[in-house]
Regions:
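Signature of N-terminal electron-transfer/Fe-S-associated modules in redox systems
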Residues: 1-134
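Single conserved hydrophobic/aromatic residue that forms the stacking wall/gate
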Residues: 138-147
Length: 147
């Protein structure tokens, strides 16, 4: 970890020992949506919701796994990132029980909150839960054959 200056949505932010760009953004008061990051746990980077776009190169990367870099310029809210995040939420919803009224997390669900925040009222993708089960069964069977 180190010290330096980054630019988050044109806001100059000094960082000092923040382990990743997500924490630098939080320090700047810029909230980036995420599902899997928690500062007390090891970085996982699986949800991909915290993607940021590097100015100049257009490269996108997960802010939770990206170390801060001096003079780095990033964008957190481009049209490309919003489209990307909407698709991630839709994919998560496609593998999620859609009968929220019977779920104990109803109205206290981060996925519901994100869907509302990003204006998702309809999921374009088919229900993928059965496909995931089949894939897991196939993987388990293949693993059993190796033992």
């Amino acid at each position: 970890m180190s010290k330096g200056v980054m630019y988050v949505d044109n806001i100059r932010v000094e960082y000092d020992n923040e382990p990743n760009v997500l924490e630098v953004c939080r320090k700047a008061g810029v909230e980036i949506p995420n599902f899997c990051f928690h500062s007390d746990l090891s970085v996982y980077g699986a949800c991909r919701m915290c993607m940021v776009e590097e100015e100049g190169t257009g490269k996108i990367d997960a802010a939770c796994t990206m170390p801060p870099k001096n003079e780095l310029h990033i964008r957190t809210n481009t049209a490309r990132l919003l489209k990307y995040r909407r698709m991630i939420i839709e994919l998560l919803l496609s593998a999620h029980c859609r009968d929220c009224t019977t779920c104990e997390k109803n109205r206290a669900c981060r996925l519901q909150e994100m869907a509302v925040r990003f204006g998702i009222h309809h999921v374009r993708f088919d229900d993928t839960r059965e496909h995931v089960k089949i894939c897991l069964l196939y993987t388990s069977d293949a693993a059993d054959d190796l033992i």
